[in-house]
Amino acid sequence: MFGSKRLKNVKEAFKSLKGQNSETPIENSKASFKSKNSKTSTISKDAKSSSSLKIPISSNNKNKIFSLAETNKYGMSSKPIAAAFDFTQNLLAIATVTGEVHIYGQQQVEVVIKLEDRSAIKEMRFVKGIYLVVINAKDTVYVLSLYSQKVLTTVFVPGKITSIDTDASLDWMLIGLQNGSMIVYDIDRDQLSSFKLDNLQKSSFFPAARLSPIVSIQWNPRDIGTVLISYEYVTLTYSLVENEIKQSFIYELPPFAPGGDFSEKTNEKRTPKVIQSLYHPNSLHIITIHEDNSLVFWDANSGHMIMARTVFETEINVPQPDYIRDSSTNAAKISKVYWMCENNPEYTSLLISHKSISRGDNQSLTMIDLGYTPRYSITSYEGMKNYYANPKQMKIFPLPTNVPIVNILPIPRQSPYFAGCHNPGLILLILGNGEIETMLYPSGIFTDKASLFPQNLSWLRPLATTSMAASVPNKLWLGALSAAQNKDYLLKGGVRTKRQKLPAEYGTAFITGHSNGSVRIYDASHGDIQDNASFEVNLSRTLNKAKELAVDKISFAAETLELAVSIETGDVVLFKYEVNQFYSVENRPESGDLEMNFRRFSLNNTNGVLVDVRDRAPTGVRQGFMPSTAVHANKGKTSAINNSNIGFVGIAYAAGSLMLIDRRGPAIIYMENIREISGAQSACVTCIEFVIMEYGDDGYSSILMVCGTDMGEVITYKILPASGGKFDVQLMDITNVTSKGPIHKIDAFSKETKSSCLATIPKMQNLSKGLCIPGIVLITGFDDIRLITLGKSKSTHKGFKYPLAATGLSYISTVEKNNDRKNLTVIITLEINGHLRVFTIPDFKEQMSEHIPFPIAAKYITESSVLRNGDIAIRVSEFQASLFSTVKEQDTLAPVSDTLYINGIRIPYRPQVNSLQWARGTVYCTPAQLNELLGGVNRPASKYKESIIAEGSFSERSSDDNNANHPEHQYTKPTRKGRNSSYGVLRNVSRAVETRWDAVEDRFNDYATAMGETMNEAVEQTGKDVMKGALGF
């Protein structure tokens, strides 16, 4: 009568999982990842259980049972500010404002390196596949080893660093200084080169001008013997081999030339300052970017200016006396430009980042698709001018937020060269508030798909607005996780080190809600799960809206795998774990789904409170948390929600309304404003809990909905069975429990066994047997805890010095000296100052008192959760949470570290000059010659073993790039291979994501691309052979 069919349905949902992924071992979900000096926490089951997988602990001295230890971290300790990607090892490094470097690899691979100086990091570069060079805000250079995962050396540069460049295959870092000098640092030998350039702008071009810093440096993408250097007023190419300036580029605007800014002062000569310069991937052209938004294209060999333009205007360097520009309209200033290329480096585009015009305005990115570059040898300057003046297409990508961009990182798919812009499929954007956005390129679609990156980055993509943790029965949890395996993760590098695990009866689910309406559910002890197993639901799709989606409350029914989520507008969506009836292999709506598409309108167009949204399930997910019902009550913001384990959902609103929903209908079985209840002094309900226990002296147990209010009152309702399988709700009592502010948490336990009295389906089924469970309700107020008996006046009180952030009951299984098993029920409290204590109940005897060993933001600590196994998940800050254990283990587990560097992966062959440049006299400089040139004949041997380890990882020719063991790291010379020749593994990833987000991108003429590559290479090789024969090379 009480829904035994429901339990059967839950079991049926997992039958399909038994034969699925049977070859993939799914391990227990309890974490063993630990910080130094920490001990792994223990898992126990409800005290009612007669058996336990718990490691025995003597309970003769309870003080020896409890000990605080951090067992895992999630997210980052502070705001991310810089990023770098290593194509060779396929690793992503993200640095924070407090000097931490997080290096991520495949699935859950992560290594954190903390620098001694806690200053913000401003730049990072991977070098030779084994080094990571880090520069902080104090211009200190750190060299980190991916092999040993340590800081190898610290370098103090003689001056302020204004620009750097490195190359994935070279030992050297070019450093531009504030005084205009360029020095060279030998990363492998840890020494500065004797080679140094003074301020060339002052010595060779503008001796009267003030001292200019170097604003931009770049290695020639085809010739390591040449570098591109920009000062404020001159850009030049410099030959390291010949030790001389090869060509100079000075952008001057004659009178009446409009230029790139919107100034009216066009009647005089101007020289806009340079902010950046870049080589075309073929090294034959360069672009200089100026502070007035001018984009100036030059012939790198002759120094001829080909075209000066802005994003929207051309020939801005030509005098136009009658030109009128609206000076009241301000153009967004260019902050940085990236010269992208596809698989064939002759097909290029510009990605331009703009600053916001005024504070609070949205930033945007602009893509100028230039298409295939005309052949240099047969195209006139006029032809090249037309090429740059008439791009194939232009796209503007507005950011979904008005937060400024602080760092942009293209993720290349083809090679680490061309400044990391070789066929990128994804662009990583770090915003000023620490949020990370990911944009597919060249489509410009923004995606927050959680499985692309490790789970610890989920806190930042986008920012988490709320979080919670819950204990889930392990068999149920592992079965669900097996359906959540995601194979579309972007990073492939590193090796996850196997963690030792302890037997566990319960797993821990961590749930985060985000500003874009997404909710992620993942295993909090992912040290035992090798995959990116996570669930993701998106309220934007379900509610068909794009704004006001920030998630503010989440309730998770762990034993029935149901979810209730509310957003800032007060809309609530109910989800349940099940097979998706709308799943499509093609990931596209079927032709007969026209009616479903018509129903995808906003909830504002609906009159009912409960809206069926099952047809809004994502078509690309076979099994997971599917939307079932949206609650559109128009009652304002929610103040509390609770999705019980017996099918009832309680929703309270800040305006005072209280609603009870039976999910089985669904149906609203109760709705009333508590402000209208006689005797109630409160304005709204602040927490809801469902318990099964005796009320007063009834002599039998009932389903009770217990509500705490903002004025410290407890309102109790009985949920009674009615005819036709329905339920009635009866108000029983209103009790004033505390006078200090709102009630934050309600829990309940049995007087006799101390086991939990929270409502579950097995307890619900036993109601028909007349079982009577005398229980005690635990009420957490502002700074006190009270134990009350519903329907009676008896209570016990415990006060605290500081406000309470989180409380909860835990059930610890212990073993006596005579090997008798005993269950210990305790209450764990966390005060807002980070003080954590453990008490026995109901006598409140203190068993442990410890402080969390690091600062915790008071704004976020209230999102902490006490788990039933003695763990507590604490949200430390906006970007991080930690899992602590309060139970001391007999066996301590040694901390382990993941492997980052994989030996044997070859660094791709660096592109070289083409036949025309060769014939014109360009001297190709080999890496060995460059080492001798910059390091001298007596260059010392490397002081690091990393140098020896990485020595054989360089490809001497393009055919060496192939590595059968690591196909995702290949870099292959373009050949005729058919339609998919330009596809890498990351391209497939990005295209899969585009499909999943219902955004089908054009194929960009793959066949034409492949044919173009083949023909270009054939002509290039033929010309090279002819020249070599004719000139005697």
Swiss-Prot record:
This is Lethal(2) giant larvae protein homolog SRO7. Residues 16-45, 953-984 are annotated as: Disordered. Residues 28-45 have a biased composition (Low complexity). The gene is SRO7. Interacts with MYO2 and SEC9. It comes from Saccharomyces cerevisiae (strain ATCC 204508 / S288c). It is a peripheral membrane protein. Residues 18-27 have a biased composition (Polar residues). The lineage of its organism: Eukaryota, Fungi, Dikarya, Ascomycota, Saccharomycotina. It holds the Pfam family Lgl_C.
